[in-house]
Amino acid sequence: MKNTKLLLAIATSAALLTGCQNTHGIDTNMAISSGLNAYKAATLSDADAKAIANEGCAEMDSGNQVASKSSKYGKRLAKIAKALGNNINGTPVNYKVYMTSDVNAWAMANGCVRVYSGLMDMMNDNEIEGVLGHELGHVALGHSLAEMKASYAIVAARDAISATSGVASQLSRSQLGDIAEGAINAKYSRDKESEADDFSFDLLKKRGISTQGLVGSFEKLASLDGGRTQSMFDSHPPSTERAQHIRDRIASGK
């Protein structure tokens, strides 16, 4: 019964998409005709989703200039990573810097954390700790895993891929890149963003890191809300509101 309802929901969603095109450039008629494949993708196991994240992260790394460990960015990130830890709820975490002026950072379900040099130029280490704590929150709370599955479902519908065990090894580099891009560009709900903010606050306190950096990061990102478009918080709730929420938590001591 549960699977029948899921298949019906996918078919209904596909029908509602008629006349529209999503960010992956999928023809909606193709999406409708591939409803069964989307259903299979929706039942993708957590293990396969994380395997796809592993391959997708590697594909993203290959398409970007990664800062060396000996560079000023690499050394700064190593210090930040040591403070935050290399394991989140049992998931190993690895950190790298992409050399690009974009202001962004993201994390995938497999613990792949990437921060852009544009963000590091804009913020101090404590502020970056706050931002990365937020991204780790999406991993720990299952948000990243859900988005990886959703992104896979979209590409599966487009390319008629079935969700068989070990599917990651069957995907092309182009498909992996599309899935990864879809996952890291996900627009989370306000509730999920707030949950990740609170996770970051709690993580910083647990690790003995100042929570003021989280406030500072929001204040700096607030300056981008009405200007530059390539910001990690373009689709997030207003940064000013988020900064105030963290101030309130600091004041309450909780």
Feature-to-residue mapping (PLM):
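A Zn2+-metalloprotease active-site environment signal
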Residues: K2-L8, T18-K254
